[in-house]
């Protein structure tokens, strides 16, 4: 069972997964006005469409594009090691990447997570603002 589904089950409440997919540096420094070409998109996964719509609106208000990423069963794509985790993609690029993900990508999630954790731990004292998105894009096989 995916962690997000487990959390929803434990809480007995709707869960919306969104803000785990952006680093604190990007959240703090990269909000942009609607329509800006540099605007970062956040994938938003939830089984409750109304709750998802509320969070997409909130994301827009703080300067990012919220993109419907399906239900919680699809939320693995935005977990550490997934192609949508902290990659700072535009809405159009995020949708493109999301559509191209397969069961093979899901199968590699654990391995990519372990590699990412190791790299972040090794860089913990020297990680600078743009490093995490570049590292995550590299692990996902996305161009920088």
What are these model-predicted stretches?
Residues 23-27:
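Rossmann-like dinucleotide/flavin-binding elements
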Residues 1, 5, 9, 29-50:
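Short beta-strand and adjoining strand-loop segment in the mid-core
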Residues 37-144:
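Active-site-lining helix/loop region of Rossmann-like oxidoreductase modules
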């Amino acid at each position: 069972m995916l962690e997000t589904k487990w959390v929803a089950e434990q809480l007995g409440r709707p869960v919306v997964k969104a803000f785990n997919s952006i680093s604190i540096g990007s959240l703090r420094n990269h909000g942009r006005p609607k329509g800006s070409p540099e605007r970062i998109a956040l994938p938003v996964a939830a089984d409750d469409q109304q709750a998802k719509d509320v969070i997409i609106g909130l994301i827009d208000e703080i300067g990012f594009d919220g993109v419907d990423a399906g239900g919680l069963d699809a939320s693995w794509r935005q977990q550490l090691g997934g192609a949508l985790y902290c990659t700072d993609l535009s809405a159009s690029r995020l949708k493109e990447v999301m559509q191209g993900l397969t069961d093979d990508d899901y199968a590699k999630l654990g391995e990519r997570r372990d590699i990412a954790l190791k790299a972040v731990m090794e860089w913990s004292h020297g990680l600078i603002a743009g490093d995490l998105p570049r590292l995550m894009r590299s692990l996902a096989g996305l161009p920088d």
